[in-house]
Amino acid sequence: MSKVLITSALPYINGVPHLGHMVGCLLPSDVYARYMRMMGNEVLYVCGTDEHGTASEVGALKEGMPVEEYCDKYHARHAQTYRDFNLSFDYFGRTSSEQNKEITYHIFSQLDKNGYIAEKTMKQIYSVDDKMFLADRFITGTCPHCGYEKARGDQCENCTKVLEPTDLINARSTISGSTNLEVRETKHLFLNLPKIETKLVEWL
């Protein structure tokens, strides 16, 4: 008997879950979890709603409610839908939970202490009118690859190309529609993969 940890891609909190969520990321891991249990293995199958990022913020803006309330509302809907489909999660949580925050901070602290976190400078779009940086879904514009006029700053849903906010043509704020935008440099923290690569490959 083996101990098996299984998870699936965490569904974004925005909106009601649909068959794409099921088929794309949840059913394959659920089938695998059931199979591993049938084979006599000790299985821990975990999942949860991804409540971080612009998806939840844009969704909350559209519904005119605080982000926390929006996440509470849709987490409950996700959880109920997955119960209705009889998915066999051992634990279905939330990225906003205190437990997840503590675990994430602990892992980050250990990586930082051991020199695996690197600081780098990036260029980001800043909205002068909104007084904020516009990450992925906070910015919309024309896709440079296919000309789709409602491409987001993370991906074009028309041609599926992955994008950076700075790639967009005629970019505008999703929040206000403002085109009064600037490119500014900001500092970010990254996992230093080249430094950890050898140990990671050996572990895998």
What is the predicted function of each stretch?
Residues 1-203:
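N-terminal, positively charged nucleic-acid-binding surface of large information/translation enzymes
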